[in-house]
Amino acid sequence: MTEMLKGIAASDGVAVAKAYLLVQPDLSFETVTVEDTSAEEARLDAALKASQDELSIIREKAVETLGEEAAAVFDAHLMVLADPEMISQIKETIRAKQTNAEAGLKEVTDMFITIFEGMEDNPYMQERAADIRDVAKRVLAHLLGAKLPNPATIDEESIVIAHDLTPSDTAQLNKQFVKAFVTNIGGRTSHSAIMARTLEIAAVLGTNDITSRVKDGDIVAVNGITGEVIINPTDEQVAEFKAAGEAYAKQKAEWALLKDAKTVTADGKHFELAANIGTPKDVEGVNANGAEAVGLYRTEFLYMDSQDFPTEDEQYEAYKAVLEGMNGKPVVVRTMDIGGDKELPYLDLPKEMNPFLGFRALRISISETGNAMFRTQIRALLRASVHGQLRIMFPMVALLKEFRAAKAIFDEEKANLKAEGVAVSDDIQVGIMIEIPAAAMLADQFAKEVDFFSIGTNDLIQYTMAADRMNEQVSYLYQPYNPSILRLINNVIKAAHAEGKWVGMCGEMAGDQKAVPLLVEMGLDEFSMSATSILRTRSLMKKLDTAKMQEYANRALTECSTMEEVLELSKEYVNVD
């Protein structure tokens, strides 16, 4: 019987194929009293080691297929597996209660999950609960000899159907065979949606109950552009979806012709389309998609992929590779954004209730704790500056004195290198990320001292709306089109331009096709996004008449009071599916 469902359009693409149900194994077990608790501890150690090995392999594969940023979620999982406090408590429970490893694991991890989930005002801790749940499931499967579903074994064209896809599930999808996936839960900002867009696999999430409606082998039609899903479609519906898929493929081929074109609107205004990267390996994809710059190089992955602080020479080689790979095009490097969800095993930071609002990013860099590490990074960047057009920006800036402290270190190390006879470029722009509302509101003052702004919308929206975008309970508050967010962005752009400074954006909003027309009219100079979004965005911009968009932007900023009103207004001015 044919059924139609509507979900959240999370990743563009159209596909028709057989359903592949990703079924979770039965992980039930009996609690058993044991005499030899040391044997149970040994079983636990073996399961932990097997899980670590497994996740390390999955992470390596994710780096190759998805890039460092998407793969970073596995670092949190690996940290849970190596958490001495949790492991110690599990073993203590096994000994004290003379129970089997399965029961000890479940009792302790359930306790941690309950504690963290109870912190409703702390999204960071709730994310840690999800990490512990995923890791505990993997360790328990090894203890029971059960096999977790492995999407990497799919060897025919399929559409994956699941309640949810964990990051490790998504990282193992082979795009040669997996043409789309559909889940019961999730949204556009979930890890699986972000990974799907990187892989260029169609995805529809949040259908509520597709797993109860589909059987293995059913034909499923998925439109990741509209959010439509049809189970066992008619021949006519299959033909319609295939035609839509062919039209989308044709559209992508047309976009590819724009690889070497400048990004110019219909009335002749030029904007810079840049790409976000995490490692030098990403530069190949940046050039393949016709980026005019690197708008965000996340340097923290240099630290997260290392067992110790990366040396000045190691960093220099990485920065040099990116600058040379971009052949003179601008490269905006963000200094280390450590802290929050990015911890380093070799950097001892204090435990915090909410690390996202705590000791992180530039706050570490200009402190006594991070000063030497920061100076090493600045020296490496300065040495690499002669190999291309380097721009440096500092993350998580709230106060002018923070920028001044960081800029003073930059100036000191530049003078030191010159005194040592090391060649350094004298044309390095230094700017800041605008991701804290305090900096956005004081943009006119910052603009007098910085060379540029880059708006980090992911965090700016979260901090303005006090809502974690990865927390489904409050994800409705993550509203890029909320008039308060639009006014903040407009304020930043106008303040920068008043001082003759340029403004970029490196959050997901920069590649959002419905946001681009608004941002163009506000005067955003640089749009930095995932490399795979560049050609589509360039195609959209070529059709825009900025004069026509002016009324749209003015009305959105002055007349609208809700996100829904802005989205409804957009239908009058721009046609974006």
From Swiss-Prot:
Its EC number is 2.7.3.9. InterPro entries: PEP-util_enz_mobile_dom (IPR008279), PEP-utilizing_PTS_enzyme (IPR050499), PEP_util_AS (IPR018274), PEP_util_C (IPR000121), PEP_util_CS (IPR023151), Phosphohistidine_dom_sf (IPR036637), PTS_EI (IPR024692), PTS_EI-like (IPR006318). Its cofactor is Mg(2+). The reaction takes place in three steps, mediated by a phosphocarrier histidine residue located on the surface of the central domain. The two first partial reactions are catalyzed at an active site located on the N-terminal domain, and the third partial reaction is catalyzed at an active site located on the C-terminal domain. For catalytic turnover, the central domain swivels from the concave surface of the N-terminal domain to that of the C-terminal domain. One of its GO terms (cellular component) is cytoplasm. The gene is ptsI. It catalyses: L-histidyl-[protein] + phosphoenolpyruvate = N(pros)-phospho-L-histidyl-[protein] + pyruvate. This is Phosphoenolpyruvate-protein phosphotransferase. The lineage of its organism: Bacteria, Bacillati, Bacillota, Bacilli, Lactobacillales.
